[in-house]
């Protein structure tokens, strides 16, 4: 009779009860957090609004990656924090575009900064994946392109409810419906997890640590 681990390997890991519950929680967080950010006390203070908005991006990035991988060991916490950092750090391009550390200048740009072009995401993902292969980095680094995909895509989708998606060189879409934002955000980790499962990335990373990541 097949062992429990072998049976689990045969199932898509993104379909476990725990990951489905976690992603529903993520969707609820998206709805609640964005409603809280509409409070006048936040909207009337540029610094508070910018920091709060960036924190929400970070939390969504962390939560999304936690759904992808599950948290089974201490190193997973480091990955989750890195995912949150990647989801938040995109906004630093506002200051680069403004060529100033002034928040007012960063918030009043004539056009969107370069990291907010959604075409950058597949370019960055493929570039990092190629670098991991060319430089023969450890198997434990094979998750990084997927983490960038999840973290940056979640950021772009959330920004899309206000500004639409900027897809160079084709222009931008209309603002995304809130329902699309929530459904896409809670579905994204499952899509990523399933693709990692199909490509063998999950098995490679988990075998490196002598265990299977169960999501």
UniProtKB/Swiss-Prot annotation:
Disulfide bonds: none annotated. Signal peptide: none annotated. One of its GO terms (cellular component) is membrane. Coiled coil: none annotated. The chain crosses the membrane at residues 77-97, 114-134, 178-198. Keywords: Membrane, Transmembrane, Transmembrane helix. It is found in: Membrane. It is a multi-pass membrane protein. This is Transmembrane protein 267. It comes from Mus musculus.
